[in-house]
């Protein structure tokens, strides 16, 4: 008895009309932040802090915590890049601004600060469009996390119309 190679089995199944149900979990469709918007958010955040006299870094991560853009202003300490990224990652993990998370979950702050890539500090702000979480922006380098967060929010305000209409 001769066995059919796998390709022939598939051809026979296809021609016979056998179908396989597709589950919603088989294919994912998601909204995520594009490079151009990420770049412009980071730029606006750095410029907002610069207007206030602060040299900062801004990092935009996508909804999975992957870095899309990282900018360090002239004069910003090199460590601000890592801190900004960790703030953005914390925001993505919690799906709330890092400052709000810090206030509401001080009980687990020490443990989270030991997880590589996360830090529980003010300065991470979520990026939302049409109800979708697109990612987060983290800012570091101003004297105090609340000032970092203000620069991130100013960037999002400056690009609000573009962000709101990003999801069609």
Where are these regions (language model features)?
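Bacterial N-terminal signal peptides that target proteins for export
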Residues: 1-11
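N-terminal signal peptide c-region/cleavage motif recognized by signal peptidases
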Residues: 19-21
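Flexible, solvent-exposed loop/hinge segments and secondary-structure transition points
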Residues: 25-168
């Amino acid at each position: 008895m001769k066995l059919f190679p796998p390709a022939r089995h598939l051809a026979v199944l296809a021609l016979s009309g056998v179908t396989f149900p597709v589950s919603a979990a088989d294919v994912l469709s998601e909204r995520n932040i594009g490079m151009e918007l990420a770049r412009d958010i980071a730029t606006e955040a750095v410029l907002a802090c610069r207007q206030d006299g602060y040299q900062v870094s801004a990092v935009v991560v996508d909804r999975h915590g992957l870095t899309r853009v990282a900018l360090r202003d002239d004069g910003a300490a090199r460590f601000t890049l890592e801190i900004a990224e960790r703030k953005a990652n914390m925001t993505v993990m919690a799906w709330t601004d890092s400052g709000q998370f810090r206030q509401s979950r001080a009980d687990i702050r020490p443990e989270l600060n030991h997880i590589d890539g996360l830090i529980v500090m003010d300065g991470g702000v979520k990026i939302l469009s049409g109800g979708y979480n697109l990612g987060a922006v983290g800012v570091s380098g101003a004297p105090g996390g609340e000032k970092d967060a203000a620069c991130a929010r100013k960037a999002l305000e400056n690009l609000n119309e573009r962000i709101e209409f990003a999801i069609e």
